[in-house]
Amino acid sequence: MPVELTGVRVVELGCGLGVPSLVAAARGAELVATDWAADAIDLLHQNAARNGLTLGAKVWDWRTPWEGTFDLALAADVLYEQRNVEPLVHALQQLAPEALIGLAGRPYEQQFLRSVEAVEIAERVVRVRTAGV
């Protein structure tokens, strides 16, 4: 990820506590964090406030349409259920020309990687994996 994200429109999918969102916002991104759980969005707003950051956040289920596009999509450790694979692939197709996806060794990652290959967006998806995870 570039160090400077000023003016870059970023969406995080399945933000949870929002660590990628917080980092991107701190680097100047115009950010919208999304999660299906309202509690996650509430915690993200608390974390942003504690860090002096401002960001957009919205409850969103990947299975529903989204209006608009972004420059970059982020997601970290979101492939813990098989039912998330195809909606994630579809969301990535629609939302942004580039994506950084943090992999955490979940069982459905290979299915996800095959799916992005099948719909010919694999070149738009950069996998990020921590050594030893």
Language-model-detected regions and their locations in the chain:
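S-adenosylmethionine-dependent methyltransferases
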Residues: 1-133
